[in-house]
Each structure stands twice: as structure tokens, then as C-alpha cells.
UniProtKB/Swiss-Prot annotation:
EC number: 4.1.1.50
A single BP term in Gene Ontology: spermidine biosynthetic process
Similarity comment: family membership: Belongs to the prokaryotic AdoMetDC family. Type 2 subfamily.
Species assigned in the record: Alkaliphilus oremlandii (strain OhILAs)
Lineage: Bacteria, Bacillati, Bacillota, Clostridia, Peptostreptococcales
Protein name (record): S-adenosylmethionine decarboxylase proenzyme
């Protein structure tokens, strides 16, 4: 990782806010409406609020933060949300607001969980989607990690990518505010970064085509990633690829690729 290990000597608290917005799309082929609904039910169960809570708690630990409060909710007919409030330093119990549950026993006790940080937070929302006239279903996960102080959400990128079936990924990272060194000089960013890709493992990047759109003077960084290879069996829901004729395999693969390209581009092309 670049730049995160080199620290400034600051005056007072680090007032920089670092926000990572992470969206992944999982694409699946399910021909009939029945199969599409079954896929949505499957993905909804796979990524319910319990599992999402564990993922976010792992992210919190990876970036060196501590959970103050967790709230979670599963929705009907589908979808889930988890919100975690986090703190950079572990707080003595007498300083923690009595409304904070610290994430203890939440999964076993309640249907809704919210995690709360004193100055930072982690949230996730899921968006399953299908249309009866289209044999391709999609599942989007929207994760936001916002931190204040020295901790950086960039440390959790590889884990987040690996936690989901990530066909298309869009990542936004921005730094806001300023902090001062001991001599009073203002700093608007406290680590080196030229691209979000600098914080993604090379083995992960090999699997994707990636492009950057960065506004360096505004400390705004944007990366989009599109999976290179389509292993068709991985995209068929409850169907064996060997049941398909070669012509069908090619047609389905092309349709999957077209859907991915449109999502990656953010526009209707075909």
C-alpha cells in the first residue's frame, strides 16, 4: 500500500474526512420469470443483513476502528441495509452514549442492526433487480465508508471486492477538510495517492479492465472496473452449461457482456 504508513506530526485532532463509496454489480442469466424470482430470493438470502453485518464489522476491524453501534434491516420483498457507527480509538464505557449497543448480541436479539461511530460510519444497502422481459438479473451492493482521523477506508478495498461476486465495480474516494501540522501549516490530504488502483492487489487487478477519472486538485478519485473473462457456468442460475447448444452459449455470453458494458458505461448502448 502506498503512503498510508507515512504519518504527519499533527497539531490537535486530524480533521480530514475520507469517504470511500463502493458499488459492485453481480450479473446472472435466468431465462424464465420463475428462475429470475428464484435468483432474487437466493441472492437476498445470501446477502441478508446478518452476513452484511459481519462484512462491515470485518471492514471496521481492518481499517483499525471500533464499533459503537449497529443497526440492520431486511426488507420485503427484497434488499437489506446495515449501518455501523465507528470510532477511531476504543472508548471507555463511561464515555459511550447509552443509546449505542456496541454491536453486542445484536444479530441474535433484533431484526434491525445499526452500527455507529463517534465520527465515522460504515453503511451498506443491497438492490436486487430483474425484469420479466429480460433474461438477465442484476444485484447491486452499495457500500459507504466514511472516516475521520488517521484511519483510511482504502485498507479494506481488496476484502470488499472479494466478499461479493464483483462483475462491475465503481469506486469513488474523496478527502475533505484540512488538518494542521505542529507549525500550523494546513494539509488537505495526509497520504500519497495517484489512483485508487494503487490500493488494490495486482492479482485482483489482472482480472479486470480498469479506468480512472481523477480530479487531483479537488482530492477526488474515481475508478471503474469490468471483469475480463466470462466463465459462463458461473453466470447460469440453476442450469448446467452442458445443457446448452454452442449457439445458445455464445448468445447468452454476448448478452451478458452487453449488459455489463452498459452498466460499466452508465448508458444504454445496445
Amino acid at each position: 500500500m502506498l503512503g498510508l504508513e507515512k504519518k504527519l506530526t499533527l497539531y490537535g485532532f486530524n480533521n480530514l474526512t475520507k469517504t470511500l463509496s463502493f458499488n459492485i454489480y453481480d450479473v446472472c442469466y435466468a431465462k424464465s420469470e420463475k428462475a429470475q424470482k428464484a435468483y432474487i430470493e437466493y441472492i437476498d438470502e445470501q446477502y441478508n443483513s446478518e452476513r452484511l453485518t459481519k462484512i462491515l464489522c470485518d471492514v471496521t476491524e481492518m481499517i483499525g476502528a471500533h464499533v459503537l453501534n449497529i443497526s440492520k434491516q431486511d426488507y420485503e420483498p427484497q434488499g437489506a441495509s446495515v449501518n455501523i457507527l465507528i470510532t477511531e480509538e476504543a472508548l471507555p464505557l463511561h464515555l459511550i452514549d447509552e443509546s449505542c449497543n456496541k454491536g453486542e448480541g445484536i444479530a441474535a436479539q433484533r431484526d434491525t442492526i445499526h452500527a455507529h461511530l463517534d465520527k465515522s460510519h460504515v453503511t451498506v444497502h443491497t438492490y436486487p433487480e430483474y425484469h420479466p422481459d429480460n433474461a438477465i438479473s442484476t444485484f447491486r451492493v452499495d457500500i459507504d465508508v466514511s472516516t475521520c482521523g488517521m484511519i483510511s477506508p482504502l485498507n479494506a478495498l481488496d476484502y470488499l471486492i472479494g466478499s461479493f461476486d464483483s462483475d462491475i465495480i465503481t469506486i469513488d474516494y474523496r478527502v475533505r477538510g484540512f488538518t494542521r501540522d505542529v507549525e500550523g501549516k494546513k494539509f488537505y490530504i495526509d497520504h500519497n495517492i495517484t489512483s485508487i488502483q494503487d490500493y488494490i492487489d495486482d492479482e485482483t487487478l489482472k482480472k479486470y479492465d480498469a479506468i480512472d477519472v481523477n480530479v487531483y486538485q479537488s482530492n477526488i478519485f474515481h475508478t471503474k472496473m469490468l471483469i475480463k473473462e466470462i466463465e459462463l457456468q458461473n453466470y447460469l442460475f440453476n442450469k448446467d452449461v452442458n445443457e446448452l447448444l454452442p449457439k445458445q452459449r455464445l448468445e447468452i455470453t454476448n448478452n451478458l457482456r452487453k449488459e455489463m458494458i452498459e452498466i460499466f458505461s452508465g448508458m444504454n448502448i445496445y
